[in-house]
Structure formats: structure tokens, C-alpha cells
Curated annotation (Swiss-Prot):
A Gene Ontology term for the protein's cellular component: cytoplasm
Pfam families for this protein: RRF
Alphabetical keyword list: Cytoplasm, Protein biosynthesis
Descriptive protein name: Ribosome-recycling factor
Gene3D superfamilies membership: 3.30.1360.40, Ribosome-recycling factor
Superkingdom per UniProt: Bacteria
Function, as annotated: Responsible for the release of ribosomes from messenger RNA at the termination of protein biosynthesis. May increase the efficiency of translation by recycling ribosomes from one round of translation to another.
Provenance organism: Paenarthrobacter aurescens (strain TC1)
Keyword Protein biosynthesis: yes
Family that this chain belongs to: Belongs to the RRF family.
Location of the region described as Disordered in the Swiss-Prot/TrEMBL record: 142-161
Compartments where located: Cytoplasm
GO BP: translational termination
């Protein structure tokens, strides 16, 4: 039972790190990155559809993203969705593909994004600590109910602490990398 609790906590912590990684990827750095458009929804034949299901992405240079729709009739809808998105880029449509030029970030905007990234990183750490707290409560209950010995409970708690530290450290590493990427001119 202890092993299942630790395994479940580890899986949930892995998921929290993945969510943080996705959140960080969706924050613009001034460099072309197709992940910026993961959350763009296109109104396609009346149905809200994620952009990555309608087009392929290419990055010909550091400031340009090339979006090639699988269905050319979706060009206008994709262009409208890109214009309306919060990414802050101006798409240009040449009839076959959409080119999105990523504007240079100002110093103030970079600092603003760093604050956002730190907030998302802190949210991820809080989530990991919450998972740890719930797992610890489960472990304590197992020991209290006599399903596990106190020594086993103490060993499992040490494992849980190591697991928590490992995941918090990986969030810190992701945070440090994203911050460096944002502040790089």
C-alpha cells in the first residue's frame, strides 16, 4: 500500500512538472516557437478546433513561424484566430501559407513575462507540495491503521521528501532556463 501511495504521488508530481513545462512553452520569448500557438482555437466550419489539428508549423528563421494549413479553405479562419489570439503577432496570408513574424520584446515586456513565469513556477511548486501533503496524510493513515509499521512509514516519508525535492528542483531548472531565454536579447 505504501508503494502505491508513493507511485501515485510520483505520477501526479510528474504531471505537475509537465503542466508547468507546457505553461512555460506558451509564453513568448521573442524567438519563434510553435508552442506559442498550442492554445489557439480556430472556428473551423462552426466547430472550435485547436490550431495544431488544422496546420503544420515550420520555423524558417528565429523570428518567423510558417503555418501551412492541411485544408486551404481554413486559411482565413486560421488567420482570424491568430489575429484575435493573445500572442501579439500579425499574421500575413499569401494564399497558401500564413507567415507570422514575431516582434522583438521590449525590456519592460521581458520583465513582465519573467514575473508571469515565476508565478506559474510557484503555482507548480504549490501543486507539488499539495500532492506531497496528501500522500503524507495517506502514509500517516496507513501507519495509524496498523497497515504499515512506523519504520516503514518513516522510510516512505523520506522517499516522499526526496521525490518532492526532485520535482521542485526540476521546476526550478525549467524556471531558470525560461528566465534566461526571456532575458536574452
Amino acid at each position: 500500500m505504501i508503494e502505491e501511495t508513493l507511485l501515485e504521488a510520483g505520477e501526479k508530481m510528474d504531471k505537475a512538472v509537465e503542466v508547468a513545462k507546457d505553461d512555460f512553452a506558451s509564453i513568448r520569448t521573442g524567438r519563434a516557437n510553435p508552442a506559442l500557438y498550442n492554445k489557439v482555437i480556430v472556428e473551423y466550419y462552426g466547430t472550435p478546433t485547436p490550431l495544431q489539428q488544422l496546420a503544420s508549423f515550420g520555423v524558417p528563421d528565429a523570428r518567423t513561424i510558417l503555418i501551412t494549413p492541411y485544408d486551404k479553405t481554413a486559411l482565413r479562419d486560421i488567420e482570424k484566430a491568430l489575429s484575435d489570439s493573445e500572442v501579439g503577432a500579425n499574421p500575413s496570408n499569401d494564399g497558401n501559407v500564413i507567415r507570422v513574424t514575431i516582434p522583438e520584446l521590449t525590456k519592460e515586456r521581458r520583465k513582465e513575462y519573467v514575473k508571469i513565469v515565476k508565478g506559474k513556477g510557484e503555482d507548480a511548486k504549490v501543486s507539488i507540495r499539495s500532492i506531497r501533503r496528501k500522500a503524507k496524510d495517506s502514509l500517516d493513515k496507513l501507519v495509524k491503521d496498523g497497515e504499515a509499521g512506523e519504520d516503514e512509514g518513516a522510510r516512505a516519508e523520506k522517499e516522499l521528501d526526496a521525490l518532492t525535492k526532485q520535482h521542485v528542483d526540476s521546476i526550478d531548472e525549467l524556471l531558470k532556463r525560461k528566465e534566461a531565454e526571456l532575458l536574452e536579447v
